[in-house]
């Protein structure tokens, strides 16, 4: 029994050490900017009570796993150029252009495994298990005939994203309640480099008074999608690999709890808060509260709530307890829309 508790203590200690490299350090990009924020009301014709502005706060580029798998090679810079009226190539090769440029825009790539799939597509990446992705989006593979194969690859990606290579990774995934922690293909340097690209691109294209950009990303959480209703896969499944069903379930069991997280100002974390840290949106809000105390303001906007199977606006919290005024204040502070 003593040995058992020592083993559990070691697991919890190592998980705690894992958390120490959370990427919550804050970087101030103010010195990198050549422009300053305009004075209030300096936008030509500005009227806060009468003007309507049009934009998009949900945009994926090649840094998002789903977009890249289905042929998107556009960068954040490409996306912002498109929003300002430029043309952009569709994955099938034809040009697209807006009739009129937008007023505001935010690239919101999935924070989860941000930038990973383009890295896997490089045949020289040296990462075992990425072979199906090699050369995925080279020109000769970007055609309509590849759609079916890409769909199969995407489904395989979803099924195998938790690659439980040993008991340790399976145990960590079980204790944290997040199967994605078992992935052996997560490269923190690739992740942070892609996030830095998202930040710097938004900063480059921000033109106060004419075109407003926001540094942002998508927090991609979801609820349990197996016959287990407690929210985490059974230990037997994680340790043996038997009977696991993480991606498919009756529609009333699983749901998407995605949020677009928008930053204000010029200070940003080294990496975004993702489902690798917690599937619980309330943990996202706590992280946002902590950032606010350190001078970084953020806003979360529920996304695709119709895909949550009614769980985006439950009358109970993540732990199944009835919501109260404290919960309402907590959520409204971070997610007022």
Regions found by a protein language model. Name each.
Residues 1-8:
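Bacterial N-terminal signal peptides that target proteins for export
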Residues 8-10, 113:
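Short amphipathic alpha-helical "recognition" segments used for binding
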Residues 11-15:
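Sec-dependent N-terminal signal peptides of Gram-positive bacterial secreted proteins and lipoproteins
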Residues 17-19:
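C-terminal motif of bacterial Sec signal peptides marking the signal peptidase cleavage site
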Residues 21-337:
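Extended, charged catalytic domains and RNA/DNA-binding interfaces, predominantly
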């Amino acid at each position: 029994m003593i040995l058992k508790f020592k083993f559990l203590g070691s697991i919890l200690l190592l998980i705690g050490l894992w958390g120490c490299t959370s990427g919550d350090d804050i970087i101030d990009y103010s010195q990198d900017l050549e422009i300053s924020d305009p004075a209030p009301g300096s936008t030509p014709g500005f009227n806060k009570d009468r003007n309507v502005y049009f934009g998009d706060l949900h945009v994926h580029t090649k840094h998002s796993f789903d977009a890249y798998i289905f042929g998107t090679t556009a960068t954040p810079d490409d996306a912002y150029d498109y929003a300002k009226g430029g043309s952009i190539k569709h994955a099938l090769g034809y040009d697209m252009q807006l009739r009129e440029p937008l007023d505001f825009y935010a690239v919101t790539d999935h924070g989860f495994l941000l930038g990973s799939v383009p890295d896997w597509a490089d045949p020289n990446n040296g990462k075992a298990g990425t072979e199906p992705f090699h050369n995925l989006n080279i020109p000769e593979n970007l055609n309509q005939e590849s759609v079916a194969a890409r769909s199969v690859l995407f489904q395989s990606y979803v099924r195998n994203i938790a690659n439980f290579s040993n008991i340790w990774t399976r145990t960590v995934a079980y204790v944290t309640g997040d199967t994605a922690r078992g992935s052996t293909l997560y490269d923190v340097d690739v992740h942070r480099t892609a996030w830095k690209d998202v930040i710097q691109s938004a900063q480059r294209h921000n033109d106060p008074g004419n075109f407003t950009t926001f540094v942002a990303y998508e927090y991609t959480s979801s609820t349990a999608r197996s016959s287990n209703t407690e929210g985490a896969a059974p230990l037997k499944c994680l340790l043996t690999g038997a009977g696991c069903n993480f991606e498919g379930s009756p529609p009333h069991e699983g749901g998407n709890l995605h949020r677009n997280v928008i930053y204000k100002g010029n200070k940003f974390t080294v990496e975004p808060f993702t489902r690798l840290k917690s599937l619980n949106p309330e943990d996202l809000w706590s992280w946002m509260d902590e950032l606010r105390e350190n001078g970084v303001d953020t806003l979360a906007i529920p996304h695709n709530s119709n895909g949550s199977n009614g769980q985006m606006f439950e009358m109970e919290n993540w732990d199944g307890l009835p919501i109260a005024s404290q919960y309402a204040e907590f959520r409204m502070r971070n997610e007022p829309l």
